[in-house]
Amino acid sequence: MADDRVAGGATPPPPPPPPPLDASAFTHTPYYCEENVHLLCKELIRSGISDPAGTDLYAVFISNEEKKVPLWYQKASHSGDGFVLWDYHVICIQSRRKNGEVLDLVWDLDSSLPFPCSFIQYVSDAIRPLSFGNSTYRRLFRVIHAPVFLRSFASDRSHMKDHAGNWIQLPPKYESIVAEDGTTNNLNEYITMSMDDVKDLESMADDVYSSKHGVVINETILPEFFSRLPG
């Protein structure tokens, strides 16, 4: 077996991410990140940026029990460091393996970081793992394989209406997303998560390919999870 270490036993650095793309070229409706990522996955597949079947793509819902999710470098922020406290957020992660090299990218249409951004940079700058210890602000990550997500996810956008039926945020102009089985709304099934949902790393690396709702990982597991995937 080939030795992938460099002289002195050090691990070679990951390859550089590709040049940034113009995020404005992709469909984006503010505050509808779940739908933005759904369309983003489709466009990455259509344009040939991802695998033709989208097998290298993952939708990642970020939330927690309290629906208080701190993130940095967010375009919606009014502070210099881009800090926002979301109830939930959704990003796309592309995890690729080629010639023994690992290249994990984050596609976040709401971030001011490069688009795409290297996974390492995004985790370090936007997520800042373990910044909050075991407080109510610790983040959880529901990872769903894109082929499963594109078949299964649905939203009727009712979460964006107040009790009188008025829009809290204006909806996208296109039709709402319906799952292949006819389900019209299951958004809460994806954004609801707790520490009890986190299982052992080995089993989750397998379950992510078959579970409709993916797997839930915590901040401790996050940096290692994608490196365990076969790619």
From Swiss-Prot:
The active site is at 33, 89, 108. Its EC number is 3.5.1.122. InterPro entries: N_Gln_amidohydro_ab_roll_sf, NTAQ1, Prot_N_Gln_amidohydro_ab_roll. It comes from Oryza sativa subsp. indica. One of its GO terms (biological process) is defense response to bacterium. This is Protein N-terminal glutamine amidohydrolase. PANTHER family: PROTEIN N-TERMINAL GLUTAMINE AMIDOHYDROLASE. Keywords: Hydrolase. It catalyses: N-terminal L-glutaminyl-[protein] + H2O = N-terminal L-glutamyl-[protein] + NH4(+). The keyword Hydrolase applies. Residues 1-21 are annotated as: Disordered. Disulfide bonds: none annotated. Belongs to the NTAQ1 family. Transmembrane segments: none annotated. One of its GO terms (molecular function) is protein-N-terminal glutamine amidohydrolase activity. Mediates the side-chain deamidation of N-terminal glutamine residues to glutamate, an important step in N-end rule pathway of protein degradation. Conversion of the resulting N-terminal glutamine to glutamate renders the protein susceptible to arginylation, polyubiquitination and degradation as specified by the N-end rule. Does not act on substrates with internal or C-terminal glutamine and does not act on non-glutamine residues in any position. GO terms for cellular component: cytosol; nucleus. Monomer. Residues 11-21 have a biased composition (Pro residues). Gene3D superfamilies: Protein N-terminal glutamine amidohydrolase, alpha beta roll (3.10.620.10).
